[in-house]
Amino acid sequence: MPIGVPKVPFRLPGEEDAVWIDVYNNRLYRERLLFLGQHVDDEIANQLIGIMMYLNGEDENKDMYLYINSPGGAVLAGISVYDAMQFVVPDVHTICMGLAASMGSFILAGGEITKRIALPHARVMIHQPASSYYDGQAGECIMEAEEVLKLRDYITRVYVQRIGKPLWVISEDMERDVFMSAQEAKTYGIVDLVAIENT
């Protein structure tokens, strides 16, 4: 959690006195607002999954809203968040604010189709998964490379399913870092709407 997380007064129905609660851990989660505002790792993935499962059990009819500003991160952690989003009964709206790169864009695309939004100045980036395994036996490096290729194929096929572009287009685009504006991400199919600025 960020340093200096604000506290807000909250009163349970039927209670006279309000208590001061952490805005992230209580108030926003009660409103079904989730935030991915950091590098995707196992810890943040487990927190998001736990919250989604809790909210799913609490009320299967109320949608969830996942706000994303993330440079990406660990592939398996990102895939686990995506899988949880597909598992829960309520629709998960995804909203890109700032940057959704790498696994951040994968999670963004995993929102309920027609309910994926980018704020007007948001940026989205897709690319292929990378391996950090360079030091080891040749056999281990080969096994690692095979696993990365399997993950790349899985991610590519999910993008094809969620975006609607041909496999060869997604596969070619994932060869390098492809940055997109909010409008370009909409045209590409990662998001369905670009939010309009309030004036």
Swiss-Prot record:
The keyword Chloroplast applies. It catalyses: Hydrolysis of proteins to small peptides in the presence of ATP and magnesium. alpha-casein is the usual test substrate. In the absence of ATP, only oligopeptides shorter than five residues are hydrolyzed (such as succinyl-Leu-Tyr-|-NHMec, and Leu-Tyr-Leu-|-Tyr-Trp, in which cleavage of the -Tyr-|-Leu- and -Tyr-|-Trp bonds also occurs). Its main location: plastid. GO terms for cellular component: chloroplast stroma; endopeptidase Clp complex. Its EC number is 3.4.21.92. The keyword Protease applies. One of its GO terms (molecular function) is serine-type endopeptidase activity. Component of the chloroplastic Clp protease core complex. This is ATP-dependent Clp protease proteolytic subunit.
